[in-house]
Amino acid sequence: MELSREKVDIAMARKKMTVTNLAEAYGVSRARMNVILNSRNISTICAGKLAAVLDVDVTEILEQ
């Protein structure tokens, strides 16, 4: 699965979240969240958890 950083940024903006806020809600450090966001490949579990934190469907944050 390929994560779309642009789509994640849009979802974060809708929720008025920073990377720090996202990391706290996800349960990881800010540095680890940056690694997740900047990597192209993401596991199904990780994508699902990220989508849940952002209150979006997982398909909304993946490349098509």
Residue ranges with predicted function:
Residues 1-21, 25:
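A short, Lys/Arg-rich alpha-helix, primarily the initiator
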Residues 13, 38, 63:
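Residue-level detection of the helix-turn-helix DNA-binding "recognition helix"
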Residues 19, 30, 44-47:
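Helix-turn-helix DNA-binding elements, focusing on the entry/boundary residues of the two helices
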Residues 27-42:
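Recognition helix of helix-turn-helix/homeodomain-like DNA-binding domains
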Residues 39-52:
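Short, basic-rich loop-to-helix N-cap that marks the start of a DNA-contacting helix
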Residues 55-64:
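Short C-terminal boundary/hinge segments that cap the last helix of small helical domains
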